């Protein structure tokens, strides 16, 4: 979710204010790397506002930074219900309204309201051409328009996939405070380790809505602890 989507509470209405330094040093580096180093073809707008404007229509975030500074020429798309306007969204650089909480498709911001905005001169055809170009560019790069170049059947749940997800999870962990130098654990002085709480035995990959997956391979925290240190210390579990 681009960008500064840092809380779930009131995430569709909250107006985030942060300093330029915090924006550049904390919230944007991962997106910048995904675009410039990873070659991301699509970026999804966050639900929240940033400095008074929703992220789907935020000219500073999308037009100035994402497109002009980083050189992103792919598709900028909303999450479901993240669009709030027609003209500001077009001007900021939103390409695709993925879904909107409006009953009729023809009433979505990029449906009849967009047609009327073009007819009335509020939106120039050059902006429409820009959006079409972004979508076609991604379709060409992913071989959607050329069946002969489409990727063949892929693979699922390979050892390489499992290792990649393991590495991503391990490298994403950030230790905020190591009080009294508790870590790393000194097993020469520890006889047993208590793991307390239901989440230690639960698998966590299954979220809701679009984040729901059926993981074939997943390691619970308790399983991981026992696999890593089970031969050094007695690891005991309690539901709590």
Please give the residue ranges for each predicted region.
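Glycoside hydrolase catalytic-domain context in secreted enzymes
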Residues: 1-240
